[in-house]
């Protein structure tokens, strides 16, 4: 049954484009047809595979009431979309309501129908008029479901006569005589297709449908029935027009394209299992009619001259045309009608997704380039092949008749034999050990288990740093000399072709291959650059990111990351385009060099396809009109590269050959005749330029990486730094200066002698066996007499050693013990060490000596360590419920009874920590009196105006700012730092880091205050004064060694709202801008803030407020980038010890950094405190608008900047400073196109020479 939108079941109103309310269908479910179901009943729906049915009612009898949205074949009907509603069996369908990602938007399709969208199918440019014989011939043996209705229509002819034609609205055809088709007999047998439990094709193979998430689709791909029908009709009309226009070449092209579309239609009906006799017969007649039309049209074009055809075709009266042309047009009329008939019989659901007609790559299964692209990698299911996506396997399995639920049971060997790029990076397979022939440009895709690409053979990627850039530059420098010599040889050939022998051509060819071989290291670097930081940046912008849930990213940080990703996307896109361009240039270089050895450089030209790429590809809907058809046939839609003009004289030999071909009337196929030496020189120039381009992009990526880390470090966002660098090669390396171990690794060879304390070792050998340490063999020593690692027992034994007291080891252990033990476990080890058991087989004298020289000293050391731990290193977060089981007070009382030194003090500390309570109050840092005064006696005085800020002397402002920030810095504890980097890694008892968080918050508030003070000022001259004023304050902060405030001010002046103020920066004198440049250079993040670190080392006993972002980065890198345990290898490679050895060297490095932090808290400033200024500073930093609001104010005071006046000429802060007024997309597109031209060997040469008669 059919009904229009106004009579369908309506529940929810929607509005059309004009705002009028329209009733809308509200389906309760959406199902997709999985098996065909045909019926002749008028109250039931016939279903085809892929049809979408909107369910309105689910009947209790097993039948469902549903709706299909279809297109009407009637071109005169305004409502070309109609509803087919009826009952259907649900067993032939499956619900897809929860799989909206793979089907069209339901609401959108229904709204399109309800709004009455008129999608007209231009099935013909002229009405189709058939004779009775032709109509009956076309419709013979065709079974119509209903009797065709004909309407008499009078038609006025030019002679004044009136002819009566009969018109059928469904088929959109006129017939000169009223046709009569006998009605089909009603079958009395049961309709087996009406039973839902039976399907004609159940269990057979199914076609792969072109779901949007399966293939890399072209925008012009045919997805729905309507698109295909419209495409076929377009070529039908185009072919007829070219025939009547007497354009032979265009007609043959149009006919070729029409034949291809009819082939697609045939493939489509076959894949959709439309096996009814009516479809088969109509398709056969359609193809037969097209063949007759093609033969007769070719006879027409070859039997008469152009002038005769022009005269006949120009006749407006059809009766005066030749019989052959009338026969051709009559045949084409039948073709038009058969196409209408096919469309009428199929009556398809316009929402049905068609099988993929043109070849396309599966998503995530092919990189589409010869290079490694880490942004295309996908994490797959562990049961699946590492390179075959699940959607692809499901589709192929479904097409092979495998049930989708059994996909996971398919063996991995049958799912694919590809090697993951990530796996091959770190685990090269055995076949890589063998030599094999291949090319560096071989593609990643393939069925082989071995990959020919260089990137798959390298274990570690190249880091984005200056060292990698130096490698590229050094290799390019080696190639430049050879390349210049080759260019010189080409120039000599151009100047004197007579003396240039064939041997020299071979020599140039040999040098080309030698040059390309020298390029392999550059290709290796480009292929294996470590882009982890940019991958992490993309993941940070993803809502479903896989990072730790406890890492919080603020709104301001999200805005920055989003802006950085947007800015970097163009750079990364250009980088990959450059890689592909590099590939094209090298390939072209090799081909041109091979041409030098050929006598006829055009010997391979016949191998080239005459048709342009994408010739048979479908067209865009906007191009489906007869006016734009010419562009398609000429191939202009597929060629977007303009031919370049070469600046050289035509080769005389080429001119002679060209003239001879013209005189002999030979087909030269528009080949461009060019000078090979000039082409070779041009290829050398392109090769030279692309090498420079590679260096430029590597340098750009290095700068962008440093910019990201610079922002995170300056704003002390160590969580962002950790997330950005996670997984990067070498992440976590810490340069601790003289105390750090050089060339340190996490792999230790147990058979090598790493102990560097010979005297102590000799003294241990001389001791009796019962006095020697039991676990000494399980200690690993570093080269500077430091413990590098060891087992838990060995570390505890060394901590309580009775002969040697390693003060640094003890401090490091007590600070970082929580990363090795739980508190209960640590104290249990100490109690066990206190209660040492004597060695076996000791005599009475040996036992007394063991008690005197080892047991009692060890007990004293245990009590001393415990007392020191509770007194100096105890943190409330260390408290655990299981500690009560240790009975520490009883242990201390036992030690008192045994007269162990320090046991009384130990009992006092235990009682204070666990019995008296007030743990938090006893250990919490106390705020200074001045800070309490500032909070208790709040003053409303603020630096809220430009005048009030400028009125404060820069020296006074810097002095008071230094006093205030140093007081906050002194409140930072080592536990604040450990909490910041460990978070909940070892225990969930850690809370916030109050001291450190307050220090970071103060610095960030100061940055926002500086930037907001500038952008809120409307007067340009006052803004310039404010900039100068803050620069002077930053300079005085540097003189006072207040690097924290200095960095906060610099970060504000280089932020986006301030940095883009072109006119304001112009008003600042150059000397002041140079001063800012010198300050910024001091905080340059290159080489891990090497300038700042050297400045910090030069300070000895002077007071200082260090920039804490560097410490946070060092702590984060050291903790996250080094493993907790060492890998112990024996002399034989590959033999690993199963014991876990604690990486104590990692803890030592952390303590080195903590000691430097504590060092600057010891020396205080001798400045006079001005409470008024301090109160004003503290109060002014509150309630500052967000950075986004500041940027809007910046756009108001200086809209549309054209050119930036940069206070610093370098680009250290490019990502942070970059204005959001990016270039237009058109500008970027044109630049990219000019920079990376497509590789075309013979189409980028000079035009064919002009021939003069």
Curated annotation (Swiss-Prot):
Instruction: Region Disordered: list its residue ranges.
Output: 624-649, 1202-1253
InterPro entries listed in its UniProt record: Ras-like_GEF, Ras-like_Gua-exchang_fac_N, Ras_G-nucl-exch_fac_CS, Ras_GEF_dom_sf, RASGEF_cat_dom, RASGEF_cat_dom_sf, SH3-like_dom_sf, SH3_domain
UniProt key word rRNA-binding: no
Where does the Ras-GEF domain lie? Answer: 952-1199
The molecular function GO annotations come to:
guanyl-nucleotide exchange factor activity
Provide ranges: composition bias, Basic residues.
1240-1253
Membrane spanning stretches: none
What are the BP-aspect GO terms? cell division; Ras protein signal transduction
Residue ranges of domain SH3 in the record: 26-98
Origin: domain of life: Eukaryota
Alphabetically sorted, this entry's keywords are: Cell cycle, Cell division, Guanine-nucleotide releasing factor, SH3 domain
Q: Which Gene3D superfamilies does the record match to this protein? A: Ras guanine-nucleotide exchange factors catalytic domain (1.10.840.10), SH3 Domains (2.30.30.40), Son of sevenless (SoS) protein Chain: S domain 1 (1.20.870.10)
- Domain named N-terminal Ras-GEF is located at 782-914
The protein's job, in short, is: Promotes the exchange of Ras-bound GDP by GTP.
> What is the protein name stated in its UniProt record?
Guanine nucleotide exchange factor SDC25
> Whose protein is this, by species?
Saccharomyces cerevisiae (Baker's yeast)
Q: What gene codes for this chain?
A: SDC25
